[in-house]
Amino acid sequence: MGTINDAVTEAMAKCNLALGLVAEANALVSGNATGNGIVFIQHHCDLLIERGFMSLFETLESYLESVFICYMLGEVGINGNAVIRYVNPINSEHAEKILCGKEKYIDFTSRSIITTYAENFFLHGGPFLYLNNVSQDFEDMKKIRNKLSHISIKSQREFESLVRSRISYLPTNVSVASFLMTNLPRQTESFFVHYMNTTIGIINALANPAVPVP
C-alpha cells in the first residue's frame, strides 16, 4: 500500500496517458494514417477514445479507494492537514476488512456509498464530501462507463438522457466517443477534457483536506 503522494502521482500520470491516447487517436484519423495497407478510420479512433475514458474512470475508482484507506491508516494530506478518523486499523489489510465488513468489496464508483462510509469513518466525512460538489460530473462519468461496460436498455437510456441534458438534444446515432469529443455548450472544452479536469480536481481536493473543525 503506497502513500497519498504515491496515489496522486500515479493517478495524474494515468490521466495524462488517457489524454494523450485520445489526442493521438484524433491526430491519426485526421491525418488519414495508414500502416501495412490498413487505413486508420473513425471507428478505430472511437475505440481508442472510449478506451481512454475507461482508463480515466478506472483511475478515479482506484484513487478513491487508495486515498480512503490511507486516511483510515492516519496518513496526513499532502498539505500536512490531518483527517480525524473514527477507526484505527493496524495495516492496509485490516483497513480493507473494516471497510468491507461482510461485503466482498465497496463500490468506489458510487458517490453515495463513498460519502456514507466517509461520514461513518471520518469527522464530517473528511475530504470525501467534496464529491457532492461535482455530483453531476461524477454521475455522468458513471453512466458513460456503464454504457461502455453493459449492453442493456437501461444503460443506453441513461446515456441518451445524459446527452440530452448536456447538449439539449440527442444527435442521430450518437456514440460515447462522439459525445466525449463534443464541446460543452458555448465553450471550447470537450466533454472528455471536462471530465478529465473533474477527475484531476477530485484528486487534488482529496489529497489536500481542509483543517478539521470539531
Model-derived regions, located:
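Short, functional N-terminal and low-complexity linear motifs
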Residues: G35, V83, S112-I114, V163-L170
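Helix-loop junctions and short alpha-helical segments
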Residues: V39-I144, R157-E158
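Short, Lys/Arg-rich flexible segments
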Residues: A25-I38, Q42-C45
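Polyanionic, low-complexity intrinsically disordered segments
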Residues: G2-G31, N133-Q136, I151-P214
